[in-house]
A protein has these predicted regions:
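Juxtamembrane regions of bacterial inner-membrane/periplasmic proteins
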Residues: 3-275
Length: 275
């Protein structure tokens, strides 16, 4: 008489029932399901951390913004800047210079309301791809806020404060006024603040007297004024000019032929020595 070995019975914790031991496919399915649940849990926790961090920086940034406008109210910003000696109004700026600045610094300047999600997303993609985290996505309005209301230190709370200020500035002023304030307060290197000082200091001219090549090279300096100053690094200033020209072509403010002609003029530019 043969003995039949009884089938092994186990308790399945997944189905919560008794039965034969799970096979290989069942085990793999259980492992994959566990890993999927673990991944979803990690992603959910990461999302919660991001939301909490975003909320923290938004609240902290708004406090910084409120503190800044106690010192310099938004509604007094234009009168404060436009009353300065050497202020250059929009009507006295060459169109080539205006086009060059917008192309180089904020190509969507006329379309956004102070903060540009498209530029921020594009800058983030560039930063992640290069690993440099050099692109900030700041609009001209945000740069104006940074230069007039805040310190130059870089941290997320200050970036949030800058955004709050930019939105408030856009509600208070039109685009021409914002552009005026921006170009009259930015630093051009060699001790020159504002387009009026820069045009006079580098070329001995008023902004309207600038040639197109001179206007374009000045538009590129504020990106890194100490590095691009024509007095100390004329070659770098010309290289930066080429970047601006390429962006003007990309924004359809110049044809490639016009840009090449201006680039050829760069080698003939005469800069006044630093005073």
């Amino acid at each position: 008489m043969s003995l039949v070995k009884p089938a092994k019975i186990v308790y399945d914790t997944v189905t919560q029932s008794f039965g034969p031991p799970p096979g290989k496919e069942h085990t793999m399915h259980t492992v994959f399901r566990f890993l999927r649940q673990l991944l979803l849990t990690v992603l959910l926790l990461a999302l919660l951390v991001l939301v909490a961090a975003g909320g923290y920086f938004a609240v902290t940034g708004h406090k910084l913004y409120e503190s800044a406008i106690q010192v310099t109210p938004i509604d007094t910003l234009y009168s404060s800047i436009s009353s300065r000696e050497g202020f250059v109004p929009y009507a006295q700026l060459p169109q080539t210079y205006i086009n060059a600045v917008i192309s180089a610094e904020d190509s969507r300047f006329t379309h956004h309301k102070g903060v540009d999600p498209v530029s921020i997303a594009r800058a983030l993609v560039t930063d992640l791809r290069t690993g440099s985290f050099a692109e900030g996505g700041s609009t001209i309005t945000q740069q104006l806020a940074k230069n007039t209301l805040f310190t130059q230190e870089k941290h997320l709370a200050r970036k949030a404060a800058e955004m709050f200020a930019a939105l408030a500035i856009e509600k208070q002023y039109n685009k021409e006024q914002i552009f005026e304030m921006y170009v009259n307060t930015i630093y051009f290197g060699s001790g020159h603040y504002g387009i009026g000082e820069a045009a006079q200091g580098y070329f001995g001219k008023t902004p309207l007297q600038l040639t197109d090549a001179e206007a374009v090279i000045l538009a590129g300096l504020p990106n890194a004024p100490s590095a691009y100053s024509p007095n100390s690094s004329p070659d770098l200033a010309v290289k930066r000019m080429q970047v601006v020209l390429n962006r003007m072509v990309g924004c359809k403010k110049l044809t490639r032929e016009q840009a090449d002609a201006l680039a050829a003029e760069a080698v003939t530019l005469q800069f006044l020595p630093a005073s």
